[in-house]
Amino acid sequence: MCWRGSRPDGRSDVQCYGTQYGRFVRGTIKFYQGDKLTGESDSVFSYDANARLIVYSQWVSNGGVGFGQATLENGEIVFQNRLPGGDEAPARSVWRKVDADSFRVARQRRADDGSWKDEQVVTYSRVAAAPKG
């Protein structure tokens, strides 16, 4: 299944998810500026039964690699990135289901007072697949 989110500046991305080996969730993201493909990312998610949370690894076509965990909080999925040493990164994404065909993603950054503040909010809608780049 794939979802597309667009921003006012013409940037968009298409995120597609499916199962892998009947046990993992595999995600791919294609980033666009207008119709031009500008980057790609892959990720794999698995459930850590001991910690009772989802862990993930992600990598990007520009060479970036990231790790983190996801938890369910008040009906939202909170994706918390981790720094290379394992500490919590000052940024996270919070996903909330809007309806059967869309979800809202708030990219947040920790403020000086310790609270989380939205930096960008994008609503993703279901699409058939990512367009060719």
Write out the residue ranges for each language-model feature.
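Hydrophobic small-molecule pocket/channel-lining residues, especially in calycin-type beta-barrels
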Residues: 1-133
